[in-house]
Amino acid sequence: MPGIKVKESESFEEAYRKFKKQTDRNLVVTEVRARRFFESKTEKRKKQKINAKKKMLKRLYMLRRYESKL
């Protein structure tokens, strides 16, 4: 569970920003959203396939972009 130590000199906005960054890093919000509704195994697999395809296309794009600079 995320938690931060606030210094006396820190403002509320700075402390809130730190807390928000920590929750984003720990994927707390995304996990809660994912568990909000039941997801069947087929839906999970479908999402995993879509994410894998996106990741592959992103890597391919980055590789082509890198090669074009050479």
Swiss-Prot record:
Pfam families: Ribosomal_S21 (PF01165). InterPro entries: Ribosomal_bS21, Ribosomal_bS21_sf. Disulfide bonds: none annotated. Transmembrane segments: none annotated. One of its GO terms (biological process) is translation. The keyword rRNA-binding does not apply. GO terms for cellular component: ribonucleoprotein complex; ribosome. It comes from the Bacteria. GO terms for molecular function: structural constituent of ribosome. Keywords: Ribonucleoprotein, Ribosomal protein. Belongs to the bacterial ribosomal protein bS21 family. This is Small ribosomal subunit protein bS21. It comes from Helicobacter hepaticus (strain ATCC 51449 / 3B1). The lineage of its organism: Bacteria, Pseudomonadati, Campylobacterota, Epsilonproteobacteria, Campylobacterales.
